[in-house]
Amino acid sequence: MSADVLTERLFEALINGDRPGARRVIAEQRERGIDAEIIMPDLFWPTYELIDSLHRRDKITNLSYNLATRLLRVLVDQSAAELVATPAPRLNRRVFAACGPSEGLELGAQMAVDLLEANGFDVRFSGGGVPTDEVQALVQQDSPDVLLMFCSSPQDLPSIRQLIDTLHEVGACPNLQLVVGGGVFNRAEGLAEEIGA
């Protein structure tokens, strides 16, 4: 079955809140020997991007969007448990990941950090809604190897940019690797470099 058809089947089940139907799509993939490390980036991620894109363009209702994202989160959580059940060799690289301060949508970030953890990174993930001064304090206190900031909402860009600028200005963690991701950065080529990440 093609990836597009599979994504469409899962999408339809999700936006209709069809929990058994969504689980059936995943169970069929597992029966074919496809594990969570493939399902997450190759099925969950494109389905999530489709849901998010249609919602931003007002092509699906808020109800359908909520049904879809809540159910997809359940499926992602279940798959994440499978990912860490057979841990990868540790890379001795510590990642602190967060979403923007007003970011309520964390599902894409959650998938990314689940995959990082499954691939040997030590990950801490605060999600969204955390003020940037608290993120800065944690980074300065714990000195992670990587600060990974997700942003799908344009209103969070100024806060993330300010955080990055402040970390550079105060010389906090000179070896800190700054990484940004999420919808805003996917839609605006060169934005990550422009803000210093």
Language-model features, listed with the residues they occupy:
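Cytosolic, long alpha-helical scaffolding segments
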Residues: A81, E106-Q110
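Short helix-loop-beta junction
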Residues: Q110-R124
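Residue-level detector of anion-binding/catalytic polar loops
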Residues: D35, D122, D145
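Residue-level signal for short, function-critical loop segments
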Residues: C99-E103
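Cofactor-cradling patches in redox/metallo enzymes
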Residues: E117, V130-E193
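A short, charged/proline- and glycine-enriched loop
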Residues: A88-V95
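A short glycine-rich beta-strand->turn/loop micro-motif centered on a GG-aromatic cluster
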Residues: D122-T132
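Long amphipathic alpha-helical segments
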Residues: M1-A88
